[in-house]
Amino acid sequence: MANEVIEKAKDNMKKSIAVFQKELGGIRAGVANASLLDGIKVNYYGVPTPLTQMSSVSIPEARVLMVTPYDKSTLDDIEHAILASDLGITPANDGTVIRIVIPQLTGERRQEIAKQVGKLAEKGKIAVRNVRRDAMDTLKRQEKDGDITEDEQRSLEKQVQKVTDDATKEIDKLADQKSQEITQG
């Protein structure tokens, strides 16, 4: 039962890291990346639909994304959704596909994005710490209820802390990699 607490904490921390990685993937680093468009929803017959379900996204050149809709009648809707996003990119609609040229990042914009990475990393660490707190509370409750001894509780709390430290280091490592990718362009 006590090992379940640690396994659950590990699993939830892995999920927190996965969410952080997905958010990092959506940050523009001056090169074309299909995951940049993952969060965009297109108003498709009144229903907000993920862009990735309505089209294929390819990368014909290093700084160009090409969006090919499955239904050509949705081109304008897709173009408007991309414009309305806060990505700072401008789509070019040629009647059959939408091309998005990813502009070079200015030094100032690179700094803003690096700060955004830092904020996302902090959000990820908070999620990990919340998982840690829940695990610690569960262990305290188990000790209080007599399910585990005080020594077992301390030992398990150390294990939870180690898992937390590892997850935090992983988030820091991912954030550092992304920051370097952005600042070195």
Swiss-Prot record:
InterPro entries: Ribosome_recyc_fac, Ribosome_recyc_fac_dom, RRF_sf. Its main location: cytoplasm. One of its GO terms (cellular component) is cytoplasm. GO terms for biological process: translational termination. It is found in: Cytoplasm. Residues 140-166 are annotated as: Disordered. Keywords: Cytoplasm, Protein biosynthesis. Pfam families: RRF (PF01765). It comes from the Bacteria. The keyword Cytoplasm applies. Belongs to the RRF family. Responsible for the release of ribosomes from messenger RNA at the termination of protein biosynthesis. May increase the efficiency of translation by recycling ribosomes from one round of translation to another. This is Ribosome-recycling factor. It comes from Lactobacillus johnsonii (strain CNCM I-12250 / La1 / NCC 533). The gene is frr.
